[in-house]
Amino acid sequence: MTFYTEFFKRLQRLMPKNIKPKFDNDEDLLAWNQEQGRLSSESIIRENKAMKMQRVLGRSGIRELYMNCSFDNYKIEHDGQRKVLKASKRYAEEFNENIASFIFSGKPGTGKNHLASAIGNYLILHGKSILLVTVADLMSNMKGTFSGTSNITEENLLHDLSSVDLLMIDEIGMQTESRYEKVIINQIVDRRSSSKRSTGMLSNLDHKGMKSLLGERVIDRMRLGNSLWLTFEWDSYRQYVKGNEY
């Protein structure tokens, strides 16, 4: 007879008959303690992940509205959304296995940014470096390297953009078309594909528009490996987003 077995028997004799103790043997107590330890460990892991996310998100380019975006809180109302969710989640889960880029194209407000951010957030928690940047910000930073006061050269910036595990370029096609923009995007995609690094693109343009804007060479490189081209064809639900859903 163990100490705890005797303890529980004495406790039951002292307690009123209408009160039943939570545990009446040492096996149940041990199992409860182990379960509490497991829950505590999971809580600590979640907190550590949240802290890591907060530290990294300041450098990832993911906007505040999308910081909590995940595959779990992506709203599904029809098969089209179910399809892009499944493909995006599989892309993130299989990221280490091969080189694969993605293009999310379609109407504004259809969830392209949500799923791109969900991919980024997932990869951050799995130790990957990601950067989400708009074409406007990208070109602004590039042109900023021309100023005499900048310590960063165009080559330095191109190197940094080519070094992150996943670079996602948003709002492709929103800017006034320029030859310099085409050259820079071409260089970035070329460098990244040559070093087996993945690139993501988000655009309101369709396949024909993307090909016309970026050229066959860039589109061809964006299709290397098990790359994705997902089309978001449904109506915008951005008007229903209040900002507190995530």
From Swiss-Prot:
Q: Which Pfam families match?
A: IstB_IS21
Q: List site positions: Probably involved in the interaction with the DnaB protein.
A: 69
Tell me which UniProt keywords the record has, alphabetically: ATP-binding, DNA replication, DNA-binding, Hydrolase, Nucleotide-binding, Primosome
Job of this protein: Required to load the replicative helix DnaB onto single-stranded (ss)DNA, to initiate chromosomal replication. DnaC alters the inter-domain and inter-subunit interactions of DnaB, inducing an open ring conformation that allows ssDNA to access the interior of the DnaB(6):DnaC(6) ring. Has ATPase activity only in the presence of DnaB and ssDNA. ssDNA binds to the central pore in the DnaB(6):DnaC(6) complex, making contacts with both subunits.
Q: Which domain of life is it from?
A: Bacteria
The UniProt family comment states: Belongs to the DnaC family.
Q: Known CDD domains for this protein?
A: AAA
The organism of origin for this protein: Buchnera aphidicola subsp. Acyrthosiphon pisum (strain APS) (Acyrthosiphon pisum symbiotic bacterium)
Summarize subunit and interaction data from the UniProt record for this chain: The helix loader is a DnaB(6):DnaC(6) complex with a crack opening large enough to allow ssDNA into the central cavity.
| GO cellular component terms, A-Z | primosome complex
Return the protein name. Replicative helicase loader DnaC
Give the E.C. number(s): 3.6.4.-
